[in-house]
Amino acid sequence: MTQNVNHQLLDRELAADDPWRLDGNPFERKRHTQMLQLALAQGSITNALEVGCAAGAFTEKLVPYCQGLTVIDVVAQAIARARQRIKEPSRINWIVCDVQQFSTDELFDVIVVAEVLYYLGDIAEMRAAIKNLVRVLAPGGHLIFGSARDANCRRWGHAAGAEPVIAMLNETLIEVERLECRGESVNEDCLLVRFRNPISAS
């Protein structure tokens, strides 16, 4: 599936009242609860990065626990919808950009990247995105990854899902905790993993 087709799919979904049913679906609420549990495993968050905000459903849950939060999304409409939703904009730095091109001198003690990487065109782009995220993960920081399983992602026309990306992340980070989230539908089946940067703070 090409990047243009993926962007068209994202635009179409974001036009809905409840994109991806993130607010109304019990599975999505459970997934967000588990993501937040993983993100807060080390306590309060100094500086977080959320990659891909959809319409801000998880951003709204995460921001109260962050001293600072940067949110990036390749789709301007996603950022616009999330900004309308969030009541504490002063804590959030909103950036429209691709995860592969994201550039900053900041380091983040928590990075959340869920249901995002399978929208990239191929494995090489996923590797580039992972390399970029690891670059901005603070020493000892945690990266929270979530994705539908590989079989579902491939059936949907994506290059890869959870299992191959988890293997790539394990090449440079240390897997600390893994959760499974399942709903009633065969499509509602994802893995959520917390990784730690093995480089210690000096």
Model-derived features with residue positions:
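Class I (Rossmann-like) S-adenosyl-L-methionine-dependent methyltransferase catalytic domain
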Residues: 1-43, 47-103, 120-132, 142-202
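A short SAM/SAH-binding and catalytic strip from SAM-dependent methyltransferases
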Residues: 110-124
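A short acidic, Gly/Pro-enriched loop at the edge of an enzyme's catalytic core
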Residues: 103-111
